[in-house]
Amino acid sequence: MAPCMLLLLLAAALAPTQTRAGPHSLRYFHTAVSRPGLGKPRFISVGYVDDTQFVRFDSDAENPRYEPRVRWMEQVEPEYWERNTQIAKGNEQIFRVNLRTALRYYNQSAGGSHTFQRMYGCEVGSDWRLLRGYEQYAYDGCDYIALNEDLKTWTAADMAALITKHKWEQAGDAERDRAYLEGTCVEWLRRYLQLGNATLPRTDSPKAHVTRHSRPEDKVTLRCWALGFYPADITLTWQLNGEELTQDMELVETRPAGDGTFQKWASVVVPLGKEQYYTCHVYHQGLPEPLTLRWEPPPSTVSNTVIIAVLVVLGAAIVTGAVVAFVMKMRRRNTGGKGGDYALAPGSQTSDLSLPDCKVMVHDPHSLA
């Protein structure tokens, strides 16, 4: 594996609802960060349905609890939150042990700050068959161990992870993971999609434009922006006379805009005076047809000050999105997508939904020890 930065069952009376055709995914991200001299490690857990964060737990909160991040989850009965809060607190203890174990495996001192992360979940197609299951761990921003696509074997990233691999193989942990990913995870994904049906199926088409930036040696940079789109999957390409410039294009990862939508840009360096020969093409499921854009010289009445102000605002939005970059990067690596912050959806129901007792909603992490 290449190193990477990991920077409800509805009440029976509720009628079935339609959801946007797949694929759909349910993923959870756990992060523990040690901070010597400042108390216990901080533990954060977030859950995503597709590109929307819907639950969160933070051990540093005044009253650490599993909490909803979208309005449609506020319909769920209190028992659900109590049960998941206890699960999250148990996971927090396992992650603290794993941090100490990793220090020993890597022969590191306890004086520095370290991170231990986990991502797990499932992705299904439009027929609700499992496309991919995930169970991955990282230490200090690099891959540690991961369940392979066959959901039967593990890949260890280094010699320390081999110790863990042998222990988990002997314990048969992959079988338990596979049962969760193929069964429980898919079922809960279906339930969450039903709960969020009014908002999760939405598509927001991108607003796109091209900016021009001066460079030395008679060159300019053309940057194609796509803003305000959802879901996160999008493709930006530059073409010269109809030929794609894949090798010469700079492309950033899709980033959350902070309002429940996403943003992305792609740029090329072109000869001064040849800007009109280059076209940007934007492909997104929210568009009836792909967009084709060229750089348009601004009217003479537009001052440089106004242009600079616009770019400053766009830059600030990008910085805001970087706060959750590791989640988006994991998503891009595992699904081929390029993906947020998360919009609070208008709730169509105000009463609590009664959820039948379900023993497993989230999946306990493994201990390295």
Curated annotation (Swiss-Prot):
Residues 22-111 are annotated as: Alpha-1. One of its GO terms (molecular function) is peptide antigen binding. Its main location: membrane. Keywords: Disulfide bond, Glycoprotein, Immunity, Membrane, MHC I, Phosphoprotein, Signal, Transmembrane, Transmembrane helix. The chain crosses the membrane at residues 306-328. Disulfide bonds join C122-C185, C224-C280. It comes from Mus musculus. Residues 112-203 are annotated as: Alpha-2. One of its GO terms (biological process) is inner ear development. Heterodimer of an alpha chain and a beta chain (beta-2-microglobulin). The gene is H2-K1. Glycans are attached at N107, N197. Belongs to the MHC class I family. Involved in the presentation of foreign antigens to the immune system. Residues 206-294 form the Ig-like C1-type domain. The lineage of its organism: Eukaryota, Metazoa, Chordata, Craniata, Vertebrata. Residues 22-305 are extracellular. One of its GO terms (cellular component) is lumenal side of endoplasmic reticulum membrane. It is a single-pass type I membrane protein. InterPro entries: Ig-like_dom, Ig-like_dom_sf, Ig-like_fold, Ig/MHC_CS, Ig_C1-set, MHC_class-I_related, MHC_I-like_Ag-recog, MHC_I-like_Ag-recog_sf. Residues 329-369 are cytoplasmic. SUPFAM superfamilies: Immunoglobulin, MHC antigen-recognition domain. The modification Phosphoserine is found at S351, S354. This is H-2 class I histocompatibility antigen, K-K alpha chain. PROSITE patterns: IG_LIKE (PS50835), IG_MHC (PS00290). Residues 204-295 are annotated as: Alpha-3. Residues 1-21 form the signal peptide.
